[in-house]
Structure formats: C-alpha cells, structure tokens
UniProtKB/Swiss-Prot annotation:
Protein name (database record): Uncharacterized protein HI_1273
Disulphide bridges: none
Annotated organism of origin: Haemophilus influenzae (strain ATCC 51907 / DSM 11121 / KW20 / Rd)
Gene3D superfamilies membership: Vaccinia Virus protein VP39
A Pfam match: Methyltransf_25
Domain of life: Bacteria
Organism ancestry: Bacteria, Pseudomonadati, Pseudomonadota, Gammaproteobacteria, Pasteurellales
Amino acid sequence: MTIYDINFAELYQQHLIACNHYNLPPIKWDKKAVKMAENLVGKPSAYNQQLLQAMNVQTDEAVLDIGCGPGTFAVPLAQQGSTVYALDYSNGMLDCLAQFKQKFGLHHLTTFHKSWADNWDDVPQADVVLASRSTLVDDLDDMIEKLCAKAKKRVFLTSVTQRHFLDEGVFEAIGREDIGFPTYIYLLNRLYQKGIQANLNFIETESGCFQGESYEDLLASVEFSLGELSEKEKQGLKAFYDRKQANNEPISHGQKKWALIWWNVDRI
C-alpha cells in the first residue's frame, strides 16, 4: 500500500467515529459567547496578528468568516472597511457580534446562522474565505467543496496540531483512554488528493496554560469538552489538580501551535 491508496476523507471519518467528543452542540458555545467576546474581540493576540498579516485583506475585498464566533476577525476586518459575511452555528456568538456591529456601526457586516452541514446556497461568494479554528467538521469533502465554491481568490484555514485541547494528564487522571481529535494532516492530505497543493505554515500561540483559579474552573473546562464526569472521575481530576498545585506545575490546555493552511484559488 502507498499513500495513493489511502482515502484521507474516509480515514478522517473513521477517526471521528472513534473520537466521541469532537462535535459540540451550539448551546455549549452560546454559554461561552459573552466570555469569549470579552477575551478575544479587540484584544491583542499573536495568533490574531499573524493570521491577519497572512491574509492581507484589502479594503476592497470581501471576506467570508466561517465559524466567526463573537467577531474575533469579523470585527477588525469590517472596521477596516472590508465587506464581511460572518457565519456561525451559535446564536449566542452571533448575538455578541450583532452588539459589536451596532456599537461600531459596521454596515458592511452581514451574519448568517449556519453550520458546516447546512445548505449554503444563500451564502455569497467572497474574495477571501477564512475558517479560523473551525475545521473539525463532520465531512471533510463537503467542507472542501463549500470552500472552493465560495472563494474567489484565497482560502485560509487553521487546524489543530495536537490531539487534545485538554492537558494530556487529565485523561490519565480520570481513567479515560481517548484517541483525541484528527489533526491538520488529514485535511492537508485530502486537499492534495483533491488537486489543491496548499501552503502550510504554523502559528505559535499564547495558549498552553490553564486559565482558571480553582478546581471548579478546571472541572468546568473538562466537562465542556468531555461531558459530565462521574464521581470517580471527579475524584481523579481533583487529585490531579491538587498535585499540580502542590508542585507548582502548570496545567497545559489549548493548542500551543496551529496549522495555517492556505492557497490561492485558480478560477479559469
């Protein structure tokens, strides 16, 4: 067998089946929307700065921001005068974005309440298509088809490089074996198989440390990703937290590095 015999879309889906917590319902993001808006929109970030520089969006270019969240990129892009179509499946995120739109008078910003799985016939094409940290999809081929259908000039995606957003020690502490998320390499290889020779860079981030002050904060972050823990699992997590505190060791959540995948669209 060679790499040409592997269907990376099928292999990706097999990985998803083995990964039982990859697809979070929108209500979970609704509850995090206000906090994310406070922490992300308009705040200095090495990740945001590097991605904006890579995209180099001009004021006369339109952008489709897929998985826009509370407006991390939609707001600054609209503020510079670009037309922005912002798409998210969380009403809570879109509500936060609507407040920024009103606050800053962003008349060139339009929102769409949609997921990757929805019909996108009414979503406009754009010069630049962005999917930042929103590429853990159900169907890799469907995502690629949508990206190619909507992009006029350039596509920019960021995808995970680590299999977990949680500290690896969490899983041992609670006694769970977990295969984790499929990483960027599936997407990169499937793009190649679809005839797209994408560019690959990496973005270093400030992530990687637990952002919270208590065991309750840690429990909340773990249950956000994994669902409700059993009492035995909570005991294991508490012991893990106490040990880290006693040894003054950080709890490393998040992706320390993101894969930036991008390409120019060749429209004949």
